[in-house]
């Protein structure tokens, strides 16, 4: 079984992925997008086997694609635990980046020690529109850091995100994605024809806007 399918299998087993057929009960993302599917990767931290599998897969992905990495950065809040586990596996320093600066104390947006010119890989739990991840990358770049790329547990493979990452010249890799999810759910007979078409049409609708 591929890494993608292994991750998807684990996410389904812990019920991190939920599909709702009834349009009136669809999920609402932070961006305002209505979605028949929700991927709650925060649940992975409660399952040692799953989080270890994710950490090892991240390490392999980073070793393969970002050989010059010097620091692992987690996105607040969902990327923080995974960044901690990966940085420990790779024996690398770690930082995490808030959505905005604190309003008290040192008012830091980046927590942890990082120096200008450092090569950083950002760890994110989920990529939808890509907006929050790109904001983190911009923050790091503003502090003189070299962002090698972003790795995520799951990506919806939305065109709006692909375009945004391309415009920012940011490389993105994910351990699993929407297309692989649909394929795997069909393989294990978790989707009927109507559900399969619903998921395809929803994503196509977003990509064609």
Curated annotation (Swiss-Prot):
What family does this belong to?
Belongs to the purine/pyrimidine phosphoribosyltransferase family. PyrE subfamily.
- UniProt xrefs under Gene3D superfamilies: 3.40.50.2020
This protein's cofactor list reads:
Mg(2+)
Arranged from A to Z, the UniProt key words for this protein are:
Glycosyltransferase, Magnesium, Pyrimidine biosynthesis, Transferase
Say if the entry is tagged with keyword Magnesium. Answer: yes
PROSITE patterns the UniProt entry points to = PUR_PYR_PR_TRANSFER
Please state the gene responsible for encoding this protein.
pyrE
Name any one Pfam family assigned in the record.
Pribosyltran
Q: How does it assemble?
A: Homodimer.
Task: Recite the lineage of the species.
Answer: Bacteria, Bacillati, Mycoplasmatota, Mycoplasmoidales, Mycoplasmoidaceae
Q: What is the name of the protein in this document?
A: Orotate phosphoribosyltransferase
Tell me which EC number(s) this protein carries.
2.4.2.10
Q: Which GO terms describe its molecular function?
A: magnesium ion binding; orotate phosphoribosyltransferase activity
């Amino acid at each position: 079984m591929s890494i993608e399918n292994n991750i998807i299998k684990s996410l389904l087993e812990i019920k991190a992925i939920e599909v709702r057929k009834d349009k009136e009960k669809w999920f609402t993302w932070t961006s305002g997008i209505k979605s028949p599917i929700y991927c709650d990767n925060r649940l992975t931290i409660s399952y040692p086997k799953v989080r270890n599998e994710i950490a090892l897969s991240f390490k392999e992905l980073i070793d393969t694609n970002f050989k010059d990495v010097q620091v692992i950065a987690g996105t607040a809040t969902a990327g923080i635990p995974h960044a901690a586990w990966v940085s420990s596996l790779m024996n690398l320093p770690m930082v995490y980046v808030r959505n905005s600066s604190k309003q008290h104390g040192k008012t830091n947006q980046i927590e942890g020690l990082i120096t200008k010119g450092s090569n950083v890989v950002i760890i994110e739990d989920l990529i939808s529109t890509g907006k929050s991840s790109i904001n983190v990358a911009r923050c790091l770049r503003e502090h003189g850091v070299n962002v090698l790329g972003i790795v995520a547990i799951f990506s919806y493979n939305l065109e709006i995100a692909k375009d945004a990452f391309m415009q920012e010249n940011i490389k993105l890799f994910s351990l699993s994605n929407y297309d692989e999810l649909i394929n795997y759910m069909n393989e294990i007979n978790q989707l009927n024809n109507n559900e399969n078409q619903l998921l395809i049409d929803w994503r196509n609708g977003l990509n064609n806007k």
